């Protein structure tokens, strides 16, 4: 294993907040601790994946002359990475046209690393169908709101669960902890074997393999995995993220006819209807699959590792 060091730091609130009064003290504390970590650990390279947590350490590393890399996962970078761009050696990106935000000469297109089990999921379709007890000849919809679930997505699915039964659609529904009991009760009442809810799905490789249509938030890593899978996707960006970067991520796919998008605020009314219409449109399914597959990057982890090794030679 490896040691985890925490910093007393948090993001700066865009609107007025008393929490902002603590920000200068948190920043100074984190810079001092980062300096101590670098002095003690003596790194040959420092990599930051963005956000306020990596800012102080990358800043101190660059001041000490330690080679530093930012891995920007989103299509729209946050303030921290924009500020760090001036001092780091290279910036790994997963989207095109990032020279709008960063110095072009520092950009390296690597994509985002995805989980090994997802890379090995393509030949597990039958295993996935059996595992989730799905009807063989029905389209399977996988709904994933992230590990904590997503209230609006859950409410949309729950309020229109009868549509899945009516339209003979299989459903694999990850709810998160807070919606687990309500979803279980609804699934029990509808009483269809191909419609199942789960607090958390450990076997995501099997869920992805079994799915024909996927409903997901638009986080950077999730999108990278969806590009690899090459299946029709309906994205519901979370509104509760800095810089609204999930909407930017989703829009970049929509612009390439690679995904459909439903705004979070509209999802209670429009999400299930969007799923239903997509399930009935084979041509659109094929177009979305074909286009999103063009965006996959299988070897992102290797690209980042190769760059890292070059910088420490």
Features from the language model and the residues they span:
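Active-site-proximal region of nucleotide-activated glycan assembly enzymes
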Residues: 2-3, 62-123, 134
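An amphipathic, basic-hydrophobic alpha-helix
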Residues: 13-45
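Donor-nucleotide binding loops and adjacent catalytic segments primarily
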Residues: 123-130, 134-214, 246-250, 254-258, ...
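C-terminal alpha-helical cap of glycosyltransferases
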Residues: 297-313
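Conserved nucleotide-sugar phosphate-binding/catalytic loop shared by glycosyltransferases and other
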Residues: 1-26, 177-179, 263-265
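Glycosyltransferases and closely related glycan-assembly transferases
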Residues: 35-47, 53-69, 82-87
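Acidic donor-binding loop of glycosyltransferase active sites
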Residues: 43-45, 209-224, 231-232
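A short, well-ordered alpha-helix in the C-terminal region of glycosyltransferases
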Residues: 130, 284-298
């Amino acid at each position: 294993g490896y040691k985890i060091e925490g910093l007393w730091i948090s993001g700066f609130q865009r609107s007025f907040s008393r929490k902002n009064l603590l920000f200068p003290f948190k920043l100074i504390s984190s810079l001092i601790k980062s300096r101590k970590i670098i002095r003690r650990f003596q790194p040959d390279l420092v990599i930051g994946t963005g956000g306020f947590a990596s800012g102080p350490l990358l800043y101190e590393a660059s001041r000490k002359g330690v080679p530093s890399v930012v891995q920007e996962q989103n299509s729209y970078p946050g303030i921290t990475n924009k500020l760090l761009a001036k001092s780091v050696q290279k910036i790994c990106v997963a989207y095109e046209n990032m020279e709008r935000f960063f110095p072009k000469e520092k950009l390296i297109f690597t994509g985002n690393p995805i989980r090994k089990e997802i890379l090995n999921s393509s030949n597990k379709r039958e295993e996935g169908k059996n595992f989730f007890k799905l009807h063989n000849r029905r389209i399977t919809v996988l709904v994933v709101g992230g590990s904590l679930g997503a209230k609006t997505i859950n409410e949309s699915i729950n309020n229109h669960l009868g549509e899945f039964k009516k339209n003979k659609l299989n459903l694999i529904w990850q709810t998160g902890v807070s919606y687990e009991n309500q979803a279980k009760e609804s699934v029990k009442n509808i009483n269809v074997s191909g419609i199942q809810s789960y607090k958390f799905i450990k076997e995501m490789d099997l869920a992805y393999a079994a799915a024909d249509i996927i409903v997901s938030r638009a986080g950077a890593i999730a999108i990278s995995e969806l590009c690899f899978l090459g299946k029709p996707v309906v994205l519901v960006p979370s509104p509760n993220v800095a810089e609204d970067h999930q909407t930017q991520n989703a829009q970049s796919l929509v612009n390439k006819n690679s995904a459909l998008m439903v705004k979070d605020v509209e999802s209670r009314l429009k999400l299930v209807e969007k799923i239903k219409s997509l399930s009935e449109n084979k041509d659109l399914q094929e177009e979305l699959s074909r286009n999103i597959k063009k965006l996959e990057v299988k070897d992102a982890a290797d690209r980042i590792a190769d760059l890292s090794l070059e910088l420490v030679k």
